[in-house]
Amino acid sequence: MNFKEELKKRSKIVEEALERFLPPSTVFPPLIHQAMRYSVMGGGKRIRPSLVMAGAEAVGGSAASVLPAACAVELIHVYSLIHDDLPAMDNDDYRRGKLTSHKVYGEAIAVLAGDALLTLAFQLLAENKAGRPEDTLKVIHEAALGAGTKGLIG
């Protein structure tokens, strides 16, 4: 299987998992959940989660065991895009050919949706029972560093 085929296969797996992990848009608070889904399910190649899965397989693990972590990486990425698109940052109107979250839902809901995605990412990491607890803590620590001022924000 070539790279593009492998990426497409993994992308489908990630899309299905994200659909399961994201809260339904009808559950309270519906507008925030709608904005989360709009931003996450709005396209993208899912390269980051695919790399997480490939990395696990490269060291003898399974892609399935790291699927929650792979999705968490994607949620952190989308959170950063939502915040980056805001008027106070880059003030982008479009992302992946669609109106940005703040253009559809307003700035306040977009900020809350991004915050909720970041929180959900850490929830997925914390709830993953596939590995040893001490390894889970290391993953959470690395994700926090990567999403904070020593990573994305810095």
Regions found by a protein language model. Give the residues of each.
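Mg2+-dependent prenyl diphosphate-binding active-site environment of isoprenoid biosynthetic enzymes
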Residues: 9, 22-154
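N-terminal amphipathic/basic leader segments beginning at the initiator methionine
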Residues: 1-22
